């Protein structure tokens, strides 16, 4: 541009881009970086990876159930062979997902009867449009953020001839089991304005957090409205978890302000995302440990501490995004709330007396600090990975060191059952031969789902009904146990990985031990 043009003071020559990169404040840059980091971790952040693990688990779980529910074996095997696009509507259905999870728990606990998933699935007609069974009942059919997932709105539910009536009955039972309250806790049927307000809040969330917003919304299957009660008073919102999988329920009053809608959707969908991520492995060896919470009267279980920390880190990023919201967002959606959106401290607690722990950052520091001081071995490798990831994201917005870094996961095998620590080592009688003479054999009755894009192998033991997730190293060693003796396994491992003989021997020995302890080798 010429000097003459500038001196003319013409509006065209002096116009500045709306959001020039060179004028962006450091705070906005930090939000952008943290937003991206929250979807980068392949185990906990990358929604596509989480989805693929859940699809593999759903597929192998259906095949496992077919082994123990022969009356519904054909439909269960058909489900186990279905492709991703066919499985997702079933996996996202709250009634079917609840039945599936309940049946897996029965298998893991040694129960071999009373299954419900196969019975329900066998009575549901095929749906060429790709809608889940419960979704077919919704009238009118509304998808509030069709660009970011297949969530639908709980409107009037009419089974008609589309699905068995018992499906509607079961959905209502799951709803009733998710919230407290009497007759006033009936679902609130939303009108067009409520549905539009919900979609508007979702648009705001994805505008504030263009990476996290679409990611977490993709883990929601259904959004309903209610005026139920909770232990802390009128229900504001909840995420279904095990009782009502993939579902969010919220009070209609939360739709009055799009910023509140965005925060509510973030809050509950973050929980649903972690729920899905945790299907692929445990975080703790002692999840029931009691933890004092200064802003609450009642201690929390340790697993709840991790879930809360996961949410509060996301909330930190969201609140920073709100504080730095672009003028065009404020013009479209109005002024954001002046204060920080965080649930209030319980009266009578230490925090209430001291005026502390009223912000998300204070709570992140406390929860992360407590976890960092847990005894060694309390966190599984996946738990340590979660803590490292959350710590790295927090450091972008809160550079003050407040936790000891979680120790890095030791390199080596990972063959841990999903719901329990590894089984005891095989009896000595099965391992009389010396390590150089023994021929490791794979246990019979193992189902498999390879996931080469992730370097993982999912196995299901039809005898013990446990699931095992193997990393790339353990997968390779397991695959080489095809009748070779240990020296041959070590030699082939060294050839394929390019490691020297001592390192190969160390890796293979550790993997074999873990695979034996998990019951996958004899």
Predicted regions and their residues:
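Acidic, low-complexity/disordered tracts enriched in E/D and polar residues
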Residues: 2-9, 22, 26-74, 416-479
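Long, acidic, intrinsically disordered low-complexity segments
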Residues: 201, 205-209, 241-276, 390, ...
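Long, charge-dense tracts
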Residues: 22-182, 188
């Amino acid at each position: 541009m010429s000097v003459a043009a500038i001196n003319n003071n013409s509006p065209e020559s002096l116009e500045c881009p709306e959001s020039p990169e060179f004028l962006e404040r450091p705070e906005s840059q930090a939000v952008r970086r943290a937003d991206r980091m929250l979807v980068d971790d392949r185990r906990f952040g990358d929604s596509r990876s989480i989805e693929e693990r859940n699809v593999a688990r759903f597929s192998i779980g259906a095949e496992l159930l077919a082994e123990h529910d022969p009356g519904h074996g054909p439909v269960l095997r058909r489900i186990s062979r279905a492709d991703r696009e066919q499985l997702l509507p079933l996996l996202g259905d709250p009634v079917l997902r609840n039945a599936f999870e309940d049946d897996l728990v029965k298998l893991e606990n040694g129960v071999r009867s009373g299954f419900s998933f196969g019975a329900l699935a066998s009575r549901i007609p095929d749906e060429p449009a790709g809608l889940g069974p419960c979704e077919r009942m919704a009238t009118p059919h509304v998808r509030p953020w069709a660009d970011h997932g297949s969530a639908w709105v709980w409107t009037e539910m009419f089974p008609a001839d589309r699905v068995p009536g018992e499906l509607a009955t079961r959905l209502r039972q799951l709803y009733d089991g998710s919230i407290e309250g009497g007759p006033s806790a009936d679902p609130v049927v939303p009108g067009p304005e409520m549905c539009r307000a919900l979609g508007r809040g979702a648009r705001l969330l994805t505008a504030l957090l263009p990476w996290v917003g679409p990611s977490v919304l993709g883990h929601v299957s259904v959004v309903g409205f209610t005026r139920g009660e909770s232990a802390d008073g009128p229900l504001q919102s909840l995420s279904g978890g095990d009782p009502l999988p993939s579902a969010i329920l919220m009070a209609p009053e939360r739709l009055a302000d799009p910023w509140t809608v965005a925060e509510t959707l973030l809050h509950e969908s973050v929980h649903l995302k972690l729920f899905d991520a945790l299907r692929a492995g445990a975080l703790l060896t002692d999840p029931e440990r009691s933890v004092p919470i200064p802003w609450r009267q009642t201690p929390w279980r340790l697993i709840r501490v991790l879930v809360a920390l996961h949410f509060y880190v996301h909330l930190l990023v969201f609140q920073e995004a709100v504080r730095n919201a672009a003028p065009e967002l404020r013009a479209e959606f109005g002024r954001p709330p002046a204060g920080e959106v965080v649930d209030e401290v319980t009266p009578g607690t230490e925090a209430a007396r001291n005026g502390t722990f009223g912000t998300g950052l204070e709570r992140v520091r406390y929860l992360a600090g407590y976890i960092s001081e847990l005894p060694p071995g309390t966190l599984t490798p996946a738990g340590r990975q979660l803590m490292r990831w959350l710590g790295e994201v927090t450091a972008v917005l809160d550079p003050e060191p407040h936790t000891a870094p979680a120790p890095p996961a030791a390199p080596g095998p990972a063959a841990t059952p999903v719901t329990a620590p590894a089984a005891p080592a095989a009896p000595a009688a099965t391992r009389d031969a010396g390590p150089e003479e023994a021929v490791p054999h794979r246990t019979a009755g193992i189902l498999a789902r390879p996931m080469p894009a992730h370097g993982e192998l999912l196995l299901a033991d039809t005898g013990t009904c446990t699931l095992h997730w193997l990393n790339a190293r353990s997968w390779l060693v397991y695959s080489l146990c095809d009748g070779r003796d240990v020296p041959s396994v070590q030699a082939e491992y060294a050839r394929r990985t390019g490691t020297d003989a001592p390192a190969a021997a160390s890796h293979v020995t550790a993997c074999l031990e873990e695979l034996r302890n998990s019951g996958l080798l004899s």
